[in-house]
């Protein structure tokens, strides 16, 4: 199974590392996450600007990891259109460091 993992807390967030570690039991794992914190970005995408994509060394063996100088939605687009040779079977978003409940879901970068 091919798994794409994204988040809105950034490539260095502890939650995404734990999710990648646990997901390795299920198959091939790709982590494509924002270079920095991008909470409350919802479905925002970057237009009319270049997006920097950087391969990252990751402390979870076997994980392919990239940081993206853009939003969580940009991360998904970049992964699907440029990085992954085949579409993922599943996309996980998180693990979030804050709550995504009630009205917060409308602007959540994790949910967006």
At which residue positions do the language-model features occur?
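Residues at alpha-helix caps and immediate loop-helix transition turns in enzyme cores, especially N-
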Residues: 15-16, 106
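Glycine/threonine-rich flexible loop motifs
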Residues: 99-108
């Amino acid at each position: 199974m091919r798994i794409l993992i994204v988040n809105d807390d950034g490539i260095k967030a502890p939650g995404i590392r734990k999710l990648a570690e646990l997901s390795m039991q299920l198959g091939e794992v790709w982590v494509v996450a924002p270079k920095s914190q991008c909470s409350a970005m919802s479905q925002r995408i970057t237009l009319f600007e270049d997006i920097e994509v950087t391969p990252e060394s990751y402390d979870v063996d076997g994980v392919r990891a990239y940081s993206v100088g853009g939003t969580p939605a940009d991360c998904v687009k970049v992964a699907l259109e440029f990085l992954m040779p085949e579409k993922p079977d599943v996309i996980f978003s998180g693990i979030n460091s804050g709550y995504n409940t009630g009205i917060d879901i409308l602007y959540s970068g994790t949910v967006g």
